[in-house]
């Protein structure tokens, strides 16, 4: 369980780093803006460019968002209850878009995503293991 101030610092530093990062070869990605009640999920094997796609969508959207990469060692131990503090940060900033990279690292993440989708949040996630590639994921996100 992390204090809100620690989560805020990680969010801020990851955003600063993201803004400076080379986004690689830009891909033409369309259709995701129509997914108002669904999560946009980028999945695949490790090192295939999922994070780059997520970063490009975030940059191209130009809307305020929270981008969080869960492979950040500062987030080791992040758990479901920490999403509540992250949500407070989003609400205080008037943000309703999340970009979560390697979210499969967090146990129970599906319930947070499902709840936010029900509240019309825009959710973009990436992941690379069997858990995020599972056929059961759809039912976990839709109830």
Placement of each model-derived feature along the sequence:
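Phosphate-binding site recognition
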Residues: 1-143
């Amino acid at each position: 369980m992390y204090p809100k101030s620690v989560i805020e610092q990680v969010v801020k530093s990851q955003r600063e780093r993201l803004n400076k990062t080379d986004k690689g070869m830009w891909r033409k990605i369309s259709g995701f803006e129509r997914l108002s009640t669904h999560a946009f999920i980028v999945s695949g094997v490790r090192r295939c460019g999922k994070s780059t796609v997520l970063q490009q969508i975030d940059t191209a959207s130009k809307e305020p968002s929270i981008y969080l990469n869960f492979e950040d060692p500062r987030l080791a131990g992040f758990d479901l209850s920490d999403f509540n503090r992250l949500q407070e940060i989003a609400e205080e900033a008037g943000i309703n878009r999340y970009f979560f990279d390697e979210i499969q690292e967090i146990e129970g993440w599906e319930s947070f995503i499902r709840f936010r989708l029900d509240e019309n949040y825009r959710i973009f996630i990436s992941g690379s293991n069997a858990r995020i590639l599972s056929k059961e994921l759809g039912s976990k996100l839709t109830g």
